[in-house]
Amino acid sequence: MDDVIVRFAPSPTGYLHIGGARTAIFNWLYARKHGGRFLLRIEDTDAERSSDEAIAGILDGLSWLGLDWDNVPYFQSQFTAEHQDAAKRLLENGRAYKCFCTKAQLDEKREQARKNKTTYQYDGTCRRLTATQVTRKEQAGEPYTIRFKVPQAAGAVRIDDLVYGNIEKRYADIEDFIIVRANGQPLYVLCNAVDDIRDGITHVIRGQDGLANTPKQVLIYQGLGAPLPKFAHMSLTLDPQKAKISKRKHGEQVAVHYYRDHGFLPWAMVNFLVLLGWARADSQEFFTKSELIDAFDLGGINRTNSVFNISADEGKHFTDPKLMNINAHYLRHMPMAELLPFIKARLAKTDLWKPAFETEQRSWFVSTMELIRGRFNTLNDFETYGRAYINDDFIMDETAVRKNLKEAAAGQWLPELAKRLSELKDFESGTIEAELRLFLKDKDIKPGKLMNAVRTAITGQGVGPDFMKVLTVLGRQRVVNRLISAAGISV
């Protein structure tokens, strides 16, 4: 295969949302698989809606996902003169013309089409102007747009899409479309094609919603005498009601930064978004970076739209269960050395991080994180459910307290258990277990009742990791102190 050059060209009108992120990921994977280049172009020609904040958000989102680009990101607005020059060339070679129709005239044509119950399409009034008529109108100072002159022959634009196969659009169904506004500002349909030609883009990989522009851009390529890239249009991402995912409708819940802030791992997000519209023949679900690059191909992109099962629920089910499962998988199985920086960053946002966790307490901290991560779904769980393991200021779950402390009348025997544990020669699993067995026998308490009460007393939770390991990682002093404190709660 010739050198592959692809691009991601977002408009900086808001944050990076999951639809745009998925497009970027597919382009990045394709470039990396084929040893090609992944370019980043900021399409900022809509000056009124573009913002520096949005640009920064897009760059931060891509960086967080681990998508590196191979150029210095540039702005489409830097090449306005080049876009205008392309329009001039199309005028000169007869592939475009100046249109002097006013807004009122066009509105009248649209209204007439509505009354006739026909689809409005520009009728080519100014296409038939002679050179002399055009000159007179220009000399009179009449404003004009520039329209592309679509062939009037009985034919069609044909696209061999790498996902959807052969696509045809009849010339008769494409109006002479505007490529430059009356104020001289080139439109997206022209700018995008001209930029792709200049950058040598070999594959245009984008959402299905871009398909409407593709026949027009093919005509622009042909009008400028440029070779066509290959096109691959991805299926759309829908919400549970089968509506297209959008920033306007769904808000921050479809923003990449929303998932970063809610404790999702970057690679888990990449893994999930790839599977949201692409699959390998063997249905493999979890990939390392190298595995995914090797496995990815455009033929695996689904033609049917995918559903992102977001929910308005603010609880644990706020997002797609598959995303949660994928994140939990990586959280529980990725090498601890890779996970620790993410844990540190999360804890550092609160009062929970201590420099000692990287020095004299490192061994204890690593073993504790290894113990508790097995039940966690997001990094935020280290801050909430994991708090009791690294800080004495933690929340007691009301349900667990009511069930395991108050109903168990644990206040009667927790202080005595604390005393007996404080007197152990060694506070390690073997001696602790032996003492607990003696205590159970002496007090005639069922093992489950004791374990649940102790777990709630020392962690504030009703469930958790291996009981004996929890005791040992917390250490004698913390366990004893918390048992004594919990005795007051259970009264």
Features from the language model and the residues they span:
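Glycine- and acidic
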Residues: V6-P12, L40-D44, R198-V204, Q253-A255, ...
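Active-site cores that bind ATP or allylic diphosphates and position pyrophosphate for catalysis
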Residues: K98, T102-H233, L238-K247, A255-V256, ...
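Generic alpha-helical structural context detector
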Residues: D60, K88, Q222, N271-V274, ...
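Residue-level signal for inorganic ion chemistry
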Residues: N27, I58, L90, G94, ...
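Residue patterns forming the tRNA-binding/recognition surfaces of aminoacyl-tRNA synthetases
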Residues: Q84, N93-R95, R127, P151, ...
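C-terminal accessory/binding modules appended to enzymatic or scaffolding proteins
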Residues: L340, R402, E407-I458
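N-terminal Rossmann-like or analogous alpha/beta NTP/dinucleotide-binding catalytic cores
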Residues: M1-K115, N213-A226
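Catalytic adenosine-cofactor/nucleotide-binding cores of aminoacyl-tRNA synthetases and other
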Residues: G225-M396, T459-V491
